[in-house]
Amino acid sequence: MIRRGIVVAVDEKTARVRVQMPDLDGLVSNWLPVVHHKTQKDKAYWLPDIGEYVVVAFDEEGEHSDGYVLGAIYNDKDTPPVANKDKFFVRFEDGTEIEYDRKTHILRVKAQTVIIEGNVNVIGNVDVIGNVHATGSIIDEGGNTPHHTH
């Protein structure tokens, strides 16, 4: 049995939520697990927010006690942030955005700060608008930049 409802409680440790179903006189479900893309060797974690509109699959028993939250759905209040079938897009509450356009092959990350841990290789040209700060040497094909003189 498929139902729609609104998340009213979130348990971050167990990745479960409670959902209120307006079409059932405001009945609130038991704690329901949220379906995730991966949970074993690779793991994904992203819980719905309190107040988020979700779809729930309940067991056929009709008790509304055992079921799973399948995901959130857009509605008149919470509308899609983009309207383009070629884009993968995530916007966080603080304004951070991650966007990939499979038609233009452009990955865009908009954030106050981006931290990359590990080695980074850039193949292609690099344009920097702003200052560059390095705590170590900057090496180019012509030699070691910190020891360069004019």
Feature-to-residue mapping (PLM):
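Histidine-centered metal-binding segments
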Residues: 146-150
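Low-complexity, small-hydrophobic/phenylalanine-enriched stretches
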Residues: 100, 104-116, 120-122, 126-128, ...
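Exposed beta-strand/loop interface patches that mediate assembly or binding
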Residues: 1-102
